[in-house]
């Protein structure tokens, strides 16, 4: 039986240039080569199971074909003909043999290069559940949630009617789908879409108290139908504060508040999900939740200001150590500057 052919994203980009540009900078393009994934895969008991979502074409055409290193490439999502939801994971069917590309546009004219397939599924959340719905089932004990964003969307009470993953993560704009094609009013972006920082609202004030500056306020999730941070357990949102002098020198820092989900082993130590027995803690921010916080800094000189920073880190220090990789540098989501005159704490 002949092996189905898969085409590189670069070939698709000859007609779909804007899509190629957006996808090339996305997490989907990095799925098979991110340092965190490669370290996880090296320790996982079943590396082929990891490839199912990080290099899906490998299961169909074999790792020898270089196109598999493109991760979640064009040929993956647009060859999905069916997604089946299971209790612990979802499965999908890739249809490569006919060179038919599935998508939500149902009046497309077939070009010379490939056939087209009308697929309402491609505008709905179950498509994303193919990889964003996963529970680890240990040898003993209940299933451990790993990727739960689909389940949180599915069972959430804050989701606007009709909102699917694509509504935030693949926002629409006016564009020609292919070079020379008609301009359409609702064409989905193919980058990462909504970012973590877009879903978080931060309000704060600084008051002078007997122990120094009290930084207090609220952080809330706005518009997202799932908890934040999303994705791999061990991903962290960090909220911290620096006291900065008039010349820009950091005088002192408050310890970060960490929002994350941590999975643990039999000894209660944080561990990669494939060795986890249970959830050790879950301090993620819930949809439409408004959570208060408090940080303290020493009393400030007259010309100093407070820099409140909201960061995202791909992995906790404990998991980085367990995986023997360098701790990823945090990404800045938001920065707020609080300045004198300070109010008085009650």
What do these predicted regions represent?
Residues 1-123, 127-159:
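Sequence context of c-type cytochrome heme-c attachment sites
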Residues 62, 136, 154-346:
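Short, conserved sequence motifs used for protein processing/export or organelle targeting and
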